[in-house]
A protein has these predicted regions:
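Long, repeat-rich segments with strong aromatic
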Residues: 173-267, 271
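Short N-terminal segments immediately surrounding and downstream of signal-peptide cleavage
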Residues: 14-33
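Generic detector of short, well-ordered, non-transmembrane alpha-helical segments enriched
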Residues: 9-10, 58, 102, 157
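Alpha-helical solenoid scaffolds in large eukaryotic transport, assembly, and signaling factors
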Residues: 28-136, 213-234, 240-251, 269-275
Length: 281
């Protein structure tokens, strides 16, 4: 397992040794069919070296799609899933890369790992608690708000971080303290400081996570009242009227309203508590 994780650390070769880019694209065309279980499990971890590949056809179209396909198809072994979690956790809390691809895609793949653990538990309570902390801390440290670029593809750090929060919030083995930490972290990105205007669906992704954390019923009314009071506060503005006098204020107003609208829609569309698993899919 340690050797598997080491092979996936930042700086690992992309494509992995002995594999060409043409091989990776052929893997996608084959719908990620790898007959040998051992080969598939080794390749899964080695693909993490391509998380920051500048080509979206590789980064998104092969790496993410392959790992998502295998994880959802229960085609990876528990040791491999553990190695993925360990490597991705280290990546998320490691150095930021200039192009800005590595961390958002580490969060996105880790959301699939967290989903696998939610469906069939793999991790110990201690590892899962550590994953909650990494999800919260990594979301709070996002300061690259680039979304989609027509040639470079997606970055989408906040949305991918929210996807990870969602999977953990849905997990019945994540208790109230973990949910509280996840919601406090999410609140920091609903209306980030600066002239940041969300235009790539970030409010919707955060709203889904919040709705289903709320529906777990583990956080009391006092918590949610304080949480929404913080969201409704105009600070650092003197009042909401002041938002119209500066670009940063307009961004705060725009993002706060976008989140509240998304939250209202998610609350109506999400259905009953019995729909949690389907929505998490």
């Amino acid at each position: 397992q340690l050797l598997l994780a080491a092979a996936a650390l930042p700086g690992a070769a992309c494509p992995p040794g002995g594999i060409t880019r043409a091989d990776l694209l052929a893997l996608k065309r084959s719908k990620f069919e790898v007959a040998s279980s051992d080969e598939r499990n080794r390749l899964a971890v080695r693909l993490l070296g391509c998380l920051d590949d500048p080509d979206p056809a590789i980064r998104d179209g092969v790496v993410f799609e392959a790992l998502s396909t295998w994880l959802r198809g229960k085609a990876l072994s528990p040791p491999t899933i553990a190695a993925l979690e360990s490597s991705l956790r280290a990546t998320l809390m490691g150095e930021k890369d200039g192009p800005g691809f590595r961390l958002p895609f580490a969060a996105l793949v880790l959301s699939e790992v967290a989903r696998a653990d939610r469906i069939e538990p793999v991790f110990t309570e201690e590892i899962r608690a550590g994953l909650v902390e990494v999800a919260a801390a990594s979301l709070m440290r996002v300061d690259d708000y680039r979304g989609f670029h027509p040639t470079e593809g997606w970055r989408h750090g906040v949305a991918h971080g929210a996807d990870l929060v969602l999977q953990l919030a849905l997990n019945p083995r994540v208790a109230a303290p973990g949910l509280r930490r996840l919601m406090e972290a999410t609140a920091t990105q609903i209306a980030p400081r600066g002239a940041v205007f969300y235009t790539f669906g970030e409010p919707e992704r955060m709203a889904r996570a919040v709705v289903f954390a709320y529906r777990r019923g583990l956080l009391d009314a006092a918590f949610w009242e304080a949480w929404f009071a913080g969201l409704a506060s105009p600070k650092p503005l003197a009042d909401w009227g002041a938002a119209f006098l500066q670009v940063e204020g307009l961004a705060k107003r725009h993002n706060t309203l976008a989140f509240l609208h998304a939250l209202s829609f998610a609350g109506r569309a999400g259905g009953s508590d019995g729909d949690l698993t389907a929505v998490g899919d």
